[in-house]
């Protein structure tokens, strides 16, 4: 679609700005509804739409019949038969703030002449709206929303969605009903689909919404049948042969009775205070839901009151979509710097013009690695899409190529570490470039010290990041061994470090001198060596010296140590500087641990030789306690599920590990089942 030059909203004439806004919104609609390739974040679309609404309200003569404010969606794609909706599928007006919700409630209550008003609250799914037609209880047709008046016939594709009944059940089945709802894809199903795409060497989907839309609109229903789509009913069109339920909540209950899938995250509340309470409650658990939502929908609950409120050109007056803070937004990429991680990993970081996204102001976002920058074709000066969901680190999703300035510059990975000046190296088979400076690099030094002090490493309480920053910047500590040379007087002089804090840290350091071999190995920060591998090494060799002198072949004999991990361990101990630091750490008066003979080849215990994975929250014990009990029984507790896993112990809010176990047919136990297993009872 042709593009027009972007007029400045501050200086351009309203007619010129409105023309550009209509063009930009229509282009975005086409990409979203027809191509299933949205390239404009929802928040940016909403902002532009609101601006066009404002211009048209101030200048009614600028309203055109084809303005996006006068219609619902996009054009009917070729390849599907058009379906005219007997009752239009309208979209909803949006609210973004508490003030918007209060204003909506006031308009409703003023029109109805009473307060408080009962509202049915439900989730706003991030999927594709469709209409299902049932005649005498039999599913006969499915159509997409399209432009609201005319959609696309996707009947054969929808027949493949297992959650949609082909025949309604119960005693109150109508002669005719158009069920409105949303086709979506659960996150776990989306992850599985993308894994299949990767395995087949095919393009991955950007998000569950794209995957759902693309899957539903496959020309071959057999392709749709292979895609794990789901459906929730939430509205109604034409109804014949039975009386319309008196409230929206009763409508959804009736749907449920007839076997239609209805989401359980819903409630009937009173007034603005009630809907805002529901909104904030849902917002707190949004990231834990198994599917994507982008807000909450409020509908006046009583049907007669809905009829009294009526409709405007594109939306009902009795409903409002309350949108969450956008998880995606547009901003300008000012620069690309690189940061150095604990293991020397060089990560490109986008420096951004400040943008509010995901409930926070974002100025930096990860670009992951050099290959990702190239794949996404991100350049300095671009207008980029930034995504921030929950506590996830903000990332740059992509660039708007149509807004790229002529002077946009490609990113060039530096050849020297920005912190220590050492050479940056990248192995042929790895995506990550790394600083070769090792523990000499101050950036790595800080991260290495922080890792060394972690609770699961040497557990040095009081040695936080700010203290480590001071110790390194004042050149008081260069390696982990230097920590044990620190004295009370030195610590007491640190900025914002009182005498009590200094003494507490001295006590923590003294306590940390007495540890286990496994903790010490983990504390060294060897690449690819986590807690589990550190324990395997300690059990297999019994003492540190054999590990330090082991060949790659000898390391490969350790349980679950593969070629990559074996090579990383071997290279770490082959580096003379690392050996020097280790000798300093185990010098007299420094770190000690109990050493013993190598573990027997076959571990003892009722779970000897078994691999167990923990996931979710157990009701009566923490994960660490469960892990210790399993390991004491001879089990290896792994961090991920594979074909080698013998059992998965799942608690509340178990995630992808549980899904993986079910997919592989691995036995899944709850806490009671785990206890029985520990007692020697088979499952």
UniProtKB/Swiss-Prot annotation:
It catalyses: NAD(+) + (deoxyribonucleotide)n-3'-hydroxyl + 5'-phospho-(deoxyribonucleotide)m = (deoxyribonucleotide)n+m + AMP + beta-nicotinamide D-nucleotide. Its EC number is 6.5.1.2. It comes from the Bacteria. GO terms for molecular function: DNA binding; DNA ligase (NAD+) activity; metal ion binding. Keywords: DNA damage, DNA repair, DNA replication, Ligase, Magnesium, Manganese, Metal-binding, NAD, Zinc. NAD(+) binds at residues 42-46, 91-92, 122, 145, 182, 299, 323. Zn(2+) binds at residues 417, 420, 435, 441. Residues 602-683 form the BRCT domain. Its cofactor is Mg(2+); Mn(2+). DNA ligase that catalyzes the formation of phosphodiester linkages between 5'-phosphoryl and 3'-hydroxyl groups in double-stranded DNA using NAD as a coenzyme and as the energy source for the reaction. It is essential for DNA replication and repair of damaged DNA. This is DNA ligase. It comes from Paraburkholderia phymatum (strain DSM 17167 / CIP 108236 / LMG 21445 / STM815) (Burkholderia phymatum).
